[in-house]
């Protein structure tokens, strides 16, 4: 078999007159009665191959048997297309290959999906036949983007003198965070490994070990409920460094991300990135990962609401809640009563009891609650919300968390429906100064907002024992266009501070020692100040490639129920395997 001389998508007018050897798949076959045209595809693109009896009767005879997705080896001569046949929409559109020889390297059945960017196959079918789905150019381009992103990050971190170090996949189960995937040990009867949710503790121990600068393209595993931007196994760019301040870490990540954007996406973004405190993000956008590509911020009306004539507003404030509003500029005429009812049902998903609304007209406010506001109150409302005729005002009165969640989600929905979002923009943002702990009323205990190893502000360390809910974390999240790309923090590196953190989280001394004794002991041997960040590679590629689903950025992903339609994993195992592990199944029967 002759060696391939050209990739299909790279045969250009410079090759006219040359004999070429091409290998690839049949994208399309057209029989024009005496002439057969085949679009031959490989990962670089498509080239048109012509089978003409005047050039080779033998090649034409073979071409008559060829169907879509056959794998071919074609030998032929490159010629220029005639004036009427030029296609400037494709890189090879000015030439074609006159076939002199063709051999079928492999035949193909009729494929269950169309191998094209605009395939009509359902996602389940695409996942079941993932190896066919991956042939689509849009999929290859996505994974080329992923490769370019990873390569750029590796090159950047190499210039910054980071070492790439692999950490264990079989590790210890810890109680914090999502559920672990457990792996039974055959050697240690009744004991289990866990697959890592992140390399957090190992990368900190590498700092104890004096490595100073570490990174890893790390596989991570979390047994949690899934959604469009989550997978049970995912990849993160894991970074840790000693002796750097928070500002130094953020500056380095900005330099890295601007290089990624330029080298992998061809987009210039400016640094430094804007920074916003967590409290400000929640107050202004109702989100800890605000999409800053459009305005429409939340306005706090609690002070006004406390003294207004609308009881729903006043009672919300009196019970410790708040009233906030969104002004959808110029949207009054775009939303009917039925449309607003749909918005009301939407915010109820986020816990809101309802959605109050007003339309601003030239002669005043109109809507179901307009009668509760006198002329003076109406004027205050309009001035506070900077409202003018044609605006739609939307209000939620409830607990602070419900107001933030519901209006934050409503803001994003309105931004999309009103086409306020500039899809060409890439808006990076740092969200800083997070709460260290969050209180869970159902569990009646505190949980770490990020993880238990996050360093509090020095002046807040004592609050861990007196008022844990007031302690602030030296933590930072990187946000891009309303998506959390990753999070990081400075880490606790002193045993006494770590023990205070564990105590605030409800650990007894015995529990802390049992779970994390190795880390606490390590802190007694001269641990340097350190910090880092973990960036979600899958999500970053999803955003840069313009995809809407994480599954499109992972070669062989799982479904929303964490199953693989291709291999049918998870699956039962042989009884002998269970016996070897001394395991017995106790599967509950479905009623």
From Swiss-Prot:
Coiled coil: none
Purpose of the protein: Aspartyl-tRNA synthetase with relaxed tRNA specificity since it is able to aspartylate not only its cognate tRNA(Asp) but also tRNA(Asn). Reaction proceeds in two steps: L-aspartate is first activated by ATP to form Asp-AMP and then transferred to the acceptor end of tRNA(Asp/Asn).
Gene expressing this chain: aspS
Pfam families found in the cross-reference section: GAD (PF02938), tRNA-synt_2 (PF00152), tRNA_anti-codon (PF01336)
Listed NCBIfam families: aspS_bact, PRK00476.1
Name this polypeptide is given: Aspartate--tRNA(Asp/Asn) ligase
Residues binding L-aspartate: 176, 222, 450, 491
InterPro entries the record matches: Aa-tRNA-synt_II, aa-tRNA-synth_II, aa-tRNA-synth_II/BPL/LPL, Asp-tRNA-ligase_1, Asp-tRNA-ligase_1_N, Asp/Asn-tRNA-synth_IIb, AspRS_core, GAD-like_sf
Transmembrane segments: none
Organism: Bacillus anthracis (strain CDC 684 / NRRL 3495)
Annotated positions binding ATP: 222-224, 231, 484, 536-539
Site (Important for tRNA non-discrimination): 84
């Amino acid at each position: 078999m002759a060696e391939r001389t050209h990739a299909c998508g790279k045969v250009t007018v410079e090759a006219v007159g040359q004999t070429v050897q091409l290998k690839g798949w049949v994208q399309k076959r057209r029989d024009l009665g005496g002439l057969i045209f085949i679009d031959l595809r490989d990962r670089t693109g498509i080239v048109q191959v012509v089978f003409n009896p005047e050039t080779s009767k033998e090649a034409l005879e073979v071409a008559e048997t060829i169907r879509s997705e056959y794998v071919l080896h074609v030998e032929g001569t490159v010629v220029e297309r005639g004036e009427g046949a030029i296609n400037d929409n494709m890189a090879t559109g000015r030439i074609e290959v006159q076939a002199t020889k063709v051999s079928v390297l492999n035949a193909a059945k009729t494929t269950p999906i169309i191998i094209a960017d605009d395939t009509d196959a359902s996602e389940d079918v695409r996942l079941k036949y993932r190896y066919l789905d991956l042939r689509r150019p849009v999929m290859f381009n996505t994974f080329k983007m992923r490769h370019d992103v990873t390569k750029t990050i590796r090159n950047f971190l190499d210039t910054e003198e980071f070492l790439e170090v692999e950490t264990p996949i079989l590790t210890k189960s810890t109680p914090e965070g999502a559920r672990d995937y457990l792996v039974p040990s055959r050697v240690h009867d009744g004991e289990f490994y866990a697959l890592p949710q992140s390399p957090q503790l190992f990368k900190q121990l590498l700092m104890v070990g004096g490595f100073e600068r570490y990174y890893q393209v790390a596989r991570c595993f979390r047994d949690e409920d899934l959604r469009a931007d989550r997978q049970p196994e995912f990849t993160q760019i894991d970074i840790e460094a000693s002796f750097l301040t928070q500002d130094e870490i953020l500056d380095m990540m900005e330099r890295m991300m601007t290089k990624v954007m330029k080298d992998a996406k061809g987009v210039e973004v400016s640094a430094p990135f804007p920074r916003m405190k967590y409290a400000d993000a929640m107050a202004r956008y109702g989100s800890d990962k605000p999409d800053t590509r459009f305005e429409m911020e939340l306005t706090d009306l609690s002070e006004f609401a406390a003294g207004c004539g609308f009881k729903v507003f006043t009672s919300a404030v009196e019970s410790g809640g708040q009233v906030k509003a969104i002004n959808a500029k110029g949207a009054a005429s775009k939303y009917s009563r039925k449309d607003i009812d749909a918005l009301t049902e939407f915010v109820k998903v986020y816990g809101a009891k309802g959605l109050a609304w007003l339309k601003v007209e030239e002669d005043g406010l109109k809507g179901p609650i307009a009668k509760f506001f006198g002329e003076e109150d109406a004027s205050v409302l309009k001035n506070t919300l900077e409202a003018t005729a044609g605006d739609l005002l939307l209000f939620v009165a409830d607990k602070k968390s419900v107001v933030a969640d519901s209006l934050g989600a409503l803001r994003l929905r309105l931004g999309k429906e009103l086409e306020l979002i500039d899809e060409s923009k890439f808006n990076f943002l740092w969200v800083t100064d997070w709460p260290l702990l969050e209180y869970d009323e159902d569990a009646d205990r505190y949980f770490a907002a990020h993880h238990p190893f996050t360093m509090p502000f020095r002046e807040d360390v004592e609050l861990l024992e007196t008022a844990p809910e007031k302690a602030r974390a030296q933590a930072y999240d990187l946000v891009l266009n309303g998506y959390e790309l990753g999070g990081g923090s400075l880490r606790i590196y002193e045993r006494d501070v770590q023990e205070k953190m564990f105590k605030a989280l409800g650990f007894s001394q015995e529990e802390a020692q049992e779970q994390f004794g190795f880390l606490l002991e390590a802190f007694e041997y001269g641990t340097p100040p350190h910090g880092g960040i973990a960036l979600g590679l899958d999500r970053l590629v999803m955003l840069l490639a313009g995809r809407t689903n994480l599954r499109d950025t992972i070669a062989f992903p799982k479904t929303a129920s964490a199953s693989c339609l291709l291999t049918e994993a998870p699956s039962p195992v042989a009884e002998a395997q269970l016996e070897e592990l001394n395991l017995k199944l106790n599967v509950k029967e479905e009623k």
